[in-house]
Regions:
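Short alpha-helical segments that sit at the start of domains
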Residues: 2-43
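Short acidic, hydrophobic short linear motifs in intrinsically disordered regions
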Residues: 41-55
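Short amphipathic alpha-helical interaction segments
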Residues: 59-76
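A short, conserved structural fragment
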Residues: 75-85
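Minor-groove-contacting beta-hairpin "wing" of winged helix-turn-helix DNA-binding domains
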Residues: 85-92
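Short, amphipathic alpha-helical interaction segments positioned at domain boundaries
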Residues: 94-114
Length: 114
């Protein structure tokens, strides 16, 4: 587990924006996209997200808070859309989901900006 002092030092070294991007990439690559492929639908519930987040957090020894910041950041970026009880992906990403392609973060960002 990374101490708060170490996280603060990382933010200063990399910069605030690089740190946020790192959180988004990690959340997308390790939680959001694999979860969507697992549940086999373009949306997921908060309970499903938390289960996957806890699994990834325990496996990689990363604080849950860091991963949670990644989800929030993905919502602000527009890759993930919050709808009442569920979270879904942007409509422009549906063709990738239907083909069950491993979608990299940079491609997802580019597709949502179109």
């Amino acid at each position: 587990m990374i101490s708060e002092n170490r996280l603060s030092k990382l933010r200063k070294e990399k910069g605030k924006y690089a740190y946020s991007t790192e959180n988004r990439i990690f959340a997308w690559k390790n939680i959001i996209w694999p979860l969507l492929l697992e549940v086999n639908r373009p949306w997921f519930t908060l309970k499903e997200y938390r289960t996957k987040r806890d699994e990834v957090s325990d496996t990689n020894h990363i604080p849950k808070e860091k991963i949670g910041k990644g989800l929030i950041s993905l919502i602000f970026k527009g890759l993930v859309v919050k709808e009442k009880e569920n979270y879904s992906i942007d409509d422009n990403l549906l063709p990738y989901f239907k083909k069950r392609i491993i979608l990299e973060y940079n491609i997802a960002v580019r597709e949502t900006r179109i």
